[in-house]
Amino acid sequence: MNYLPTPLNEQPLEGSFSIGLQTRIVLHAQTGELAKTGAKQLKEELHRFAGFEVPILRGEALNGDIALQLASDLPAQGYRLRVDPQGVTVAGADEAGLLHGVQTLRQLIRKSGCELSALQINDAPKLLDRGYYLDVTRGRIPKLSALKALADSLCFYKLNQLQLYIEHTYLYRELTELYRLGDALTAEDIMELDDYCAARGIELVPSFSSFGHLFELLSTKGYASLCELTAAAPSTMPNRMRHHTLNISDERALPLMRAMIAEVMPLFRSRRFNICADETFDLGKERSREELARVGERAYYMGFVKELCAFVAEKGHQPMFWGDIVQRFPDALAELPQGTICLNWGYSPEEKEDATRRLAQAGALQYVCPGVNGWNQWMPPLRDGYENIRRMAAYGKKHGAIGLLNTDWGDYGHINDTLFSLPGLVYGAVFAWCDADASFDELNAAISRVEYLDQSGKVVGLLAQMQAAYACKWYSLVHFKDFAQGNLEVGFDELAGCTDEQAARCNAHLADVMAALRACTPAMDSSTRGMLQAWVVAGEAIRLWNLVGAAVAAGREDAALAAALERWFESYKQLWRATCRESELSRLLDVVTWYAQLLRQGKQG
């Protein structure tokens, strides 16, 4: 694979083109702002990888120039890239297509420098909506600079939509009880990111919880009476995942959600709005039990979703919502406003086609929504992510989905660094763009070369091997701690399976992988070698927590391991703070501290 995503058609031509002193990047008169973005990106790429400072101008291209122009004979978002001895032409069906063509040219320049082999590429996407969905709620809120860097990556791999998952991490003007949680995104943050994304052809779509997953809001004094559950629950990582759902039988519920939606909607250019409405686990469990029993789950759930979608539509926006609940009664989709998009999620590496087929048969306008599978992991299980994304993309194309939204969640404190999700991001970009069924190894080698500038093509394949190094999973450690502290109703014996033998076996495999990663650094460009330290921090996390799990399962004291865990966390904090706000890093510190103390006393007590 020479390009990511793989072009539809590539034809070699005779000769080559040399970037020279008189080469110019020429914007044709009819081009707009996205073309200007592309020109600036090309200028930077040429300086870095071809060694030439190439000026940008607007007008008619001459021999020896790089021309950026529009062409009416191409499909939506399509482009044509031609390199011949007279120069380079990137033609786009529209501004988006032109920018996509520039990304392919950037990758060609990375590979070839100032001497470009003659060729012609004709290309267009299979799915017009290709997105990435980032959790900024469950512990980790990236700095604005990191979100902009993410937008740059989306643009480079021809993704055109970004959604940020928000529950309580936006600074609502009236919800002041949430301010104590700290580091929330502000209106200015969102508007600045929206501008940045728009300049790169990316639609920043608002995504705000408005039914389930409202734990922090419904735990406040002011809004606890709107919670479905009557008793307060401790703010633990598992509880945040499972609770709280809005009591929609309360007449105050709908106006509150409408007001929250209305406050954030104007911050975005997008004419879409994701109300979420997923995993309403507590629906009808306590305060609205009688109402649910009276009308039934379908009418009760869909009634509120219909009200929210209607409100969004009245505001001139296209509603979106997660489709896990409506899967139980897909014919109810007909009750929603025309054009409502159902977000069909499924994250298993063995995900089946049934849900996608069922929604298509019900007439749903749907996105397929796989996941990078990095949540709860120090390093994402790349094989699982690849298999899941590949399958879901294929199902979507087969059953007429209009888009793919690749998810990156942060369950249980968001230990997974977004930097490590990049291979999964690319998997989604590749399978949403084209039909090429790239093998796992082939795709990883291409990502190694294109993203990490690794001439050996090995680094991503080695990262994938870390999936086999876990003897003890993070969620097991969290469950064990919460149960011991009386914050879970049922016990978890998951640590019982973590033995010294298993930890030793996994850590021996991990040591081999880390040694091989270190050996790859001479083949990497100096600008990407800094990733090695981040990968080592993740590898050390896996190694140490394997040992912690085994020691705790055996009831063994190990003060040296406790100290090693605390030293590692200092490195982890540095990695976190390089790209993220402080957010809820303290929650992870609580887990580290609890286990360090347990290791020093050898048993619970």
Spans of model-derived segments:
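Substrate-binding groove of N-acetylhexosamine-processing glycoside hydrolases
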Residues: M1-E14, S18-L21, A35-A39, L81, ...
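Contiguous, structured surface segment used for ligand recognition
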Residues: M1-R130, R391, H414
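A generic structural motif
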Residues: Q30-T31, R138-R140, S348
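Beta-rich nucleic-acid/ligand-interaction surfaces
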Residues: L57-D65, Y170-R173, E177-Y179, P330, ...
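Conserved beta-strand edge residues that scaffold enzyme active sites
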Residues: E60-A61, H168-T169, S210-G212, V326, ...
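Conserved oxyanion/phosphate-binding beta-strand-loop segments in alpha/beta enzyme cores
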Residues: T104-L127, C155-Q163, G222, R271, ...
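N-terminal small/glycine-rich loop or linker at the start of catalytic domains
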Residues: L119-T137, Y367-N376
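Substrate-binding cleft of carbohydrate-active enzyme catalytic domains
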Residues: L128-G323, E335, I341-L343, G396
